[in-house]
Amino acid sequence: MNEDIKSFTISIYTENNIGLLNRISAIFQRRHINIESLTTSQSEIDGVNRFVIVVNMTETNANKIVKQIEKQVETIRAYYHTDEETIYQESCMFKIKSTLLFEEPQIQNIIKECNARIVTVNKEFFVLEKSGRRNEIESLRRDLNVFGIMQFVRSGRIAVTKDEMKVTEMLLAFNNQ
Amino acid sequence: MKTQTINKKQVAEKTQRITGSEAIVKSLMAEGVDILYGYPGGAIMPVYDELYKFQDQIHHVLTRHEQGAAHAAQGYARISGKVGVAIATSGPGATNLITGIADAQIDSTPIVCITGQVPSHLLGSDAFQETDIVGISTPVTKWNCQVTKSEDIPKAIAKAFYIAKSGRPGPVLVDITKDAQFGELDFKYEKCKGIRSYIPIPKTDPQSIIAAAELINNAKKPMIVWGQGVILGQAEEELKAVIEKAGIPAAWTILGASALPTSHPLNIGMVGMHGNYAPNKLTNECDVLIAIGMRFDDRVTGDLKTYAKQAKIIHFDIDPAEIDKNVKSDVAVLGNSKESLALLFDALNKNSHDSWLKEFKDLYAIEFEKVIKGDINPTKEGLTMGEVLKQINIESKGNAAIVSDVGQHQMIACRYADFNVSKSNITSGGLGTMGFALPAAIGAKMAAPDREVVAIIGDGGYQMNIQELGTIFQQKAAVKIVVLNNEFLGMVRQWQQLFFDKRYASTEMTNPNFVAIAEGYYIKAKKVTKREELAEAVKEMMASKESFFLEVCVEKEDNVFPMIPSGASVSDVRLS
């Protein structure tokens, strides 16, 4: 009966409400579920926000939690998906000493090979940006770590699902009531 | 320019320029509120000033503690089905409401709490009596919000009432800054009719009704367990019709009590930790278990791994998050119980299950012999809680509303009180809040002044909100108060006896003179210590037109049985 713990991406469409993040995070906290990453942004629908939350848990719990999230008054819809059911990316930035760019020719090769982008360069430092899967970002970080990284930051996961989200239909149905 | 002038004129006709605080009171009145419970203080004073002006239209009940206000609002809501309202100031006033709000959340009680808040320019500055009440109340409210602009007040209150009452009801808190109360707005009140992100009642899938009916029609040993969802959905008649048509024995959770009269031949009693022997035991014998408006609380199910594993489970609920939360269902029927039970009724065959029903009767006979007889007709010297309930039944004829607190007396009250009328068992079920009963009884009595309201309380819980005797006295609320005094925190003591080798850690109480305290509040009071005094005293209390306090000194170390020890299976219910 012991169910596997898997990584799930939880997508939540919500009204833009100041206290909702608290309500949603409390639902995870109650069950001692650690949030691996959380991003919130505008969704494809004007005025509707979208949370993308990555958690590791059993599917049974994912199902229960999604229903408890959906129950919140300002949640429009909530879904959970496995990694295979989503297209996902993370993004990261590195701040590195500018001198290294000229002194260590290998760095230029690393940047080219991994499709990273130089955002800015000045006398002291340059900033590198890369989007991709976690393992790609991690491998880049390992490669650059040899030369020294001044700052590193990685975003939470953003994801779109392969299947359709019927949020617009739901909102239209409400308007037509 | 011309059109603008016309528009302005139209607006002027429809709206009034008033202060935020007046708008709060007018919004409450527009929602039909004629009574509210609360306690004044700095950040809510502008609203109290308006309540003073409108006192002939809206009655403010000054409780003696904000917790009392929240529980009184709950009692009001539970007996009437209407939204109860509590009001408090910022800081401690607001935090004192929290226990009542949490209680209302877990027991799905519609209440709206209005709290004052420090002026918006002081928010976040640790101002005097500032607490982040929206943050604090978030996990225990169905919805909450903070209003910092006067013009947002009517909409926030309209939304609060709509959310509290619709779908699965619950508590809502609206926190309003003092500057929003002082500011002015063009007042126009429109009731909230819907929120696009919120579906209060999910649609009932006709297929689910067909599937449920098929299981029930083919069942040999069907059993119903209903909960408060039947009462909240006003589906008492529909439940009765379903039970009678299909001849199904039906048991109730503590909050479902009174939806079907106690005397109904298919009413087989209470399930759960101290429920009746037969429905607990036969939960693990039935072939179809039909759960209606209940949430498979751990106090109902005991060990989930051994709960009704042999049965097909049908779960009726308004809240999709309850489906498969604790017990996996074979058929889930979403929707309002009133409508879904009516649909089920049409799809059911007329049936009877006499030999199955006899199994319940046989087990009841065992429970009667081993437990009930000794509880209600004791032969030992000390008084029992059960015989007090029996006397109350004799006098009330099953027509009183029973408001119980939490503990042994609560289990006895729910097991033995007779109910003819729905919404008559008012108790703190999910949260188990000691101190609930006295203020809740005030709210219940004020909502239903024509009904007899009897608060049954232990000596422990009574002292948790004993200050509300002041409210009873001031309001002349004719609440009947029965304290079953065993000089112990009885339920904890029972557990200490059974599971902690009788180490009675901090459960013995040295009690004050309760009669003198009641009399100090000018409430008629009596104390009973002997069996021969009991009947007369209960009679006098029930006949009293005013509030009455009755202390009954009961056996100190009685236990409540049957009992399913924590974590045990329902079929391991103990009779001693």
Positions of the model-derived regions?
Chain B
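N-terminal alpha/beta PP-like core and its mobile active-site loop of ThDP/TPP-dependent enzymes
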Residues: 2-348, 352, 391, 395-398, ...
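Phosphate/pyrophosphate-binding active-site segments
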Residues: 2-15, 151, 189, 310-406, ...
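Active-site diphosphate/adenylate-binding microenvironment
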Residues: 21-25, 29-34, 42, 47-52, ...
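Active-site nucleophile and cofactor-binding loops and adjacent substrate-binding regions
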Residues: 39-41, 60-71, 86-93, 148-149, ...
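Thiamine diphosphate
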Residues: 114, 122, 128-129, 324-326, ...
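A glycine-rich phosphate-binding loop feature that marks nucleotide/adenosyl-phosphate handling sites
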Residues: 175-180, 407-409, 555
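Conserved short loop/turn motifs at secondary-structure junctions
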Residues: 227-231, 377, 458
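Generic enzyme active-site microenvironment
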Residues: 173, 315, 403, 456-457
